A protein has these predicted regions:
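Conserved helicase C-terminal RecA-like lobe
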Residues: 74-75, 101-102, 106, 111-172
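A polyampholytic, Gly/Pro-enriched intrinsically disordered region
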Residues: 22-25, 51-54, 123-131
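Amphipathic alpha-helical transducer elements in NTP-driven molecular machines
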Residues: 7-10, 14, 55, 154-157
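Conserved helicase/translocase motor-coupling segment
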Residues: 49-114, 118, 123
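Short, glycine/serine-rich, charged loops/turns that create anion-binding
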Residues: 7, 85, 126
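Conserved coupling/interface region of RecA-like P-loop/ASCE motor cores
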Residues: 1-36
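Glycine-rich phosphate-binding "P-loop"
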Residues: 30-60
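Structural preference for long, well-ordered alpha-helical segments in enzyme cores
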Residues: 16-17, 58-62, 160
Length: 172
């Protein structure tokens, strides 16, 4: 079935996610239309590598969402998504200050089928435990898996698509 409408993400997020996944020509080519037609300022890219910088950025971003939510009167949800569980940041220090939003860390796999107002993606850099994963699969596992795909990182691209499309309003 060719699903062409999304109720979860806005049009800007749908455009970025679709464009990314469809770089793989084996993927079903389609145009995805969102109910929310917003396309401006819906994906923000930051390149941070040091743990302290990442924690400061997360704290600042979550507090900005919290404060904006106070103004709108609507409590907002945030997913912090990482490729692996060890990407989970320690943000316990800001919990007492959050009245207008909630945040939760999830792996990208565990976020499938879920939605949050905002998504912050972690670990989008190169390396062994980064995203996309560069670790080789266990040779025994390869015996039961289907043949490798022609397009590099095809499964990682699909997983990244999942991560992007968990957000309703904005992806960081």
């Amino acid at each position: 079935t060719k699903l062409t409408q999304t109720f979860r993400s806005n049009q800007g997020i749908a455009n970025v996610a679709s464009g990314f996944i469809q770089k793989n020509k084996s993927q079903l080519q389609k145009v995805v239309n969102a109910i929310d037609k917003t396309t401006s300022k819906v994906v923000e890219i930051n390149f941070l590598t040091k743990a302290q910088e990442i924690n400061e950025y997360l704290t600042r971003t979550i507090m900005e969402i919290n404060n904006a939510s106070a103004s709108s009167g609507k409590k907002k949800s945030i997913y912090i998504l990482g490729r692996y569980k060890h990407h989970k940041p320690n943000l316990d220090s800001i919990l007492p200050f959050l009245r207008n939003c909630t945040f939760e860390f999830k792996t990208i796999h565990s976020s499938k089928g879920l939605q949050a107002d905002y998504v912050i993606l972690l670990g989008l850099n190169s390396g062994g435990s980064a995203f996309p994963a560069e670790k080789e699969d266990d040779p025994l596992l390869n015996l039961v898996l289907p043949q490798p795909e022609i397009h590099n990182f095809a499964e990682e691209r699909r997983l990244f698509y999942v991560a992007l499309t968990r957000a309703k309003e904005k992806v960081y």
